[in-house]
Amino acid sequence: MPKLIIKSILILMVSASSTWVLADGPKEQIHYLEQSRATAQAFMHALGGTLKSLMETADPENAIIVCKQIAPALAADYSKDGWIVKRVSLKSRNKKMGVPDAWEQRELESFDRHHLSGEPTDELEMSAIVDETDGLWFRYLKAIPTQPMCLQCHGKSEDIPGGVKTILAKEYPDDDAIDYSAGEIRGAISIKRRISVNE
């Protein structure tokens, strides 16, 4: 199994039947990987900064506004020039936007296994060239660690403030995104770009 902490350029090509490891992928693929890493870092910096500012100056209920409105808006801002950016999780809060596809789910489950084996959560990532029904796609997934400030909305049920619980029950009646501990994998940033279209 390929190591998920990518210290050097490593591109995986995945099909329904086989997996190929290309240690020195084409320059375009290397560029995609570098650009995806930069986008994931910028996205999390912007989202985390906004969330931290709200948590320091207002009630924790305001953090829900960030996750519901600002996070999707940020993802839309970064989804341009052929790129698609979103957040996904095995325990999603927003069932319309946060549910992983088959590739994302498989890699998220792999992230969890690597986390349980002791690998640093904030270094877990995976890139691949995936053969999908509509063409070949460059895929990138970067784990999102659960930060201490996230626990007021994503922590143990008994530790979540009552006001937050009330809003969550109203806005997300099918919410699964609770019972996390600091350092666990909350989800991932998923970035993709189509390379070619199937004929």
Where are the regions that the model predicts?
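Extracytoplasmic c-type cytochrome modules immediately beyond a signal peptide or single-pass transmembrane anchor
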Residues: 23-147, 159-199
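N-terminal signal peptide c-region/cleavage motif recognized by signal peptidases
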Residues: 16-18
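Detector for the c-type heme attachment site
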Residues: 151-158
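Bacterial N-terminal signal peptides that target proteins for export
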Residues: 1-9
